[in-house]
Amino acid sequence: MEDEKNENLMTFIQFCATFITITLFIMPLKTIRLIIEKKNVGTVAGLQFISSVLNCFLWISYALLTSNTTMLFVNSIGMMFSIYYVFNYWKNINQVRASRDYLKKVMIACVLAITIISISYYNTVDDLDTRISRLGFLSSVVCVLMFASPLEKMAIVIQSKNSEGMIINVAILSLLCGLSWTIFGLLLNDIYIYLPNILASILSFVQLTLIKLYPPQILL
């Protein structure tokens, strides 16, 4: 009976994590379509899309090592969307120098991905556990660095007492996403899944709190 309850809980959490995460991956689609329509990236930051490709690639690699079909499915979809975003963002950068700089960032991400995979597989021919630990740790570090990027924006919000630019729907979805993957990781007893997502949940909660404390204002 207890096993059945745990299995039902796992199925429910898998569904929630999958649905919410894919929804988050789809959300930038509207922005990218506007960029394509205007043939200009405007003030949209493109690094987020490169980071998303790198993050998805690393977790796909981790999912393959651990035979985690849920993570494999979600991050494969996320990677496809993210590559689409990166390509169309780069294609619509009007300045030659900015376009080259963006390509350099893409190349750096590729080198970083290859380096992480190489470190994870180095001298671990018959040692799957070490390979999993290395890749899980390094993927978590990259994940945590991504989550830390909104901290600068939060500091600006606190100083200006204005949360303009923070979207409440995204913050809510991010919180739910972090919580669902945290529970998923805890059920699997996988520290490399639940630890970075605990941090993601905390940061999303802080964002929601800031939006509540400092409602968005249009500054003239």
UniProtKB/Swiss-Prot annotation:
Membrane topology: Multi-pass membrane protein
GO cellular component: Golgi membrane; membrane; plasma membrane
Keywords, comma-separated and alphabetical: Cell membrane, Golgi apparatus, Membrane, Repeat, Sugar transport, Transmembrane, Transmembrane helix, Transport
Any one GO biological process: carbohydrate transport
Positions of the MtN3/slv domain: 12-92, 134-217
Claim: Iron is one of the keywords in the record: no
Keyword Iron-sulfur in record: no
Family: Belongs to the SWEET sugar transporter family.
PANTHER family: RAG1-ACTIVATING PROTEIN 1, SUGAR TRANSPORTER SWEET1
Protein name: Sugar transporter SWEET1
Organism: Dictyostelium discoideum
UniProt gene name: slc50a1
